[in-house]
Amino acid sequence: MIGAFKRNRGSSQSFAKECQPSTLKANLEVAKELPFSDRRDFEDATQGYIGSLSDEQIIGPDGGVVWCMKSYGFLEPETPANTVNPSLWRQAQLNAIHGLFKITDNVYQVRGLDISNMTIIEGNTSLIIIDTLFTTETAQESLKLYYRHRPQKPVRTVIYTHSHSDHYGGVKGIVKEADVKSGEVQIIAPVGFMESVVAENILAGNAMHRRSQYQFGMLLSPSVKGHVDCGIGKAASHGTVTLIAPTIIIEEPVEERTIDGVDFVFQLAPGSEAPSEMLIYMPQQRVLNMAEDVTHHMHNLYALRGVEVRDGNQWAKYIDAARVAFGSKTDVLIAQHHWPTTGQMRINELLKKQRDMYKFIHDQTLRLLNQGYTSRDIAETLRMPSSLEQEWSTRGYYGTLSHNVKAVYQKYLGWYDANPANLNPLPPVAYAKKAVEYMGGADAVLARAYKDFQKGEFRWVASVVNQLVFADPNNHQARELCADALEQLGYQAEASTWRNAYLVGAMELRQGVPKRRSTGKRNNIAVLNNEMFFDFLAVRLNATKAEGKIIVSNWCFINSNERFVITLENCALTYIQGWQTDADATITLKRTTFEALLANEITMVDFLRSKEVEIEGNRLRIEELLKLFDDFDQSFPVVEPMGGST
């Protein structure tokens, strides 16, 4: 899942500093250790190229830039910049290759026009689209690019491989919702798709969107000192994210369907890269689509934006099941990120090494935690076997061995390391103030931290000086030194996600947090069923404001004729289907009107005055209830305490 935030271009590079000698040394060592002479990935990434956008950018209806690849022209030199890890530089170059590509007869991909790929299959009379990119603008332009080179068959089928927004967000750019409702267009998705969308993008959506700014570097300008890549793709487009609910659900572990003359075998892979995911084999074309379960890097078992931990053991089994079932019958392996792999020997080798990578991380973490090591101990000491470490396809550009180890630990043992000293620590600000006091005060800490910074001990400096920031966010020397340390860590990071997080943290320490209020997610809210809708509403209930209140109301939605009893009691909002005769009030409304209120498109006054809203009984109780819900702030602080600096 990726949040749709516009990059604040030009704001980060002007404050950025040069790399320190120790950073330069570390990056030069990387250049010596890895097989940079192996150019097969570049050959694969350019094979089948047909054409691309002439000006390398996509402009939205408001005139804003939605996507711009030419901003990454600085990646053209073979020699990496000193401020970028050479391994990440190579991945960034590969992800900069963009356009329409032929995979095999009747199968095409648009790559590099968003963070994900669009796969286009030509049926007898129509097109079948696998994944619709992140935004409507990039999806629309990708389809236009295809039509410039291929027959203009209509899109009649959309397939979502999984429940992350960069794979469904552009759907309204290529099909109309009315055509889906009429049955003219079908949308196919794996079982649990909508539930996963709600859980990841709605219930915890605001926090994930904010954290996504760090993971994907959405506030950074493209430059050698700023944004260079996202590992899984170049960058997330910043346009319009939409969603149309699927009309057909794949429910069986392996399910075969024929769509407009094209045979498909769907293999469910729940709990792998997403809670709801499936792999796709096309026997006529001998193409295996591994969705996002096999890509050209180490993926996340835990995403830094926040997500349910993924099961590395099960993930490995899904990969092997696909290898056994389809490996000997596949000539081209594709995914919904990155470039294809051709030839059975190479395909099977890729599948085996990806399988073994996730299996190794899972099993070795469990071996060591069973010996009593903590997650941080294991992450610090475990190393990949040399047979995998020298493979480009297992390098950590998105996930890392370090945070994937911690994910496995969390999955089995949770956050607590069993040391009672860590059972109930002080909260961050109180801890920071006490720690600074014990260390002799801010000046003493800064004096030692400056010396350690010169030695290249950036991890320690960032950690200890961030305590100064939390103890006193107005300590500008501490903010600057912490930013400097984070920046050097970013310059050294092989993982795009780590680089982005470090550099966004440095930027916000220097410039503050860009302020923006949530405008809601109308498109996502609109596709929720009523139960999901009330779950989302309950998450926004402010318990402090609700203290001591008991409100019972009937809700009747005109569009669906469904009725619910909503109860506020004990600072919890619950619901059941039905009707309560002695409720405080009854509200009859079109759900779209309430969606507009939750998305901040209309005010409370407008809502209550709307002709589409009727209230019987105690109107004041409905007003009282609606005032209890929070409007989430998309700009909450991350590298400084809540409240921030003044």
Swiss-Prot record:
Zn(2+) 2 binds at D166, H167, E292, H337. Its EC number is 3.1.6.-. GO terms for biological process: dodecyl sulfate metabolic process. SMART domains: Lactamase_B (SM00849). Zn(2+) 1 binds at H162, H164, E273, E292. Induction: Expression is increased in sulfur-limited chemostat cultures. SUPFAM superfamilies: Metallo-hydrolase/oxidoreductase, SCP-like. This is Alkyl/aryl-sulfatase BDS1.
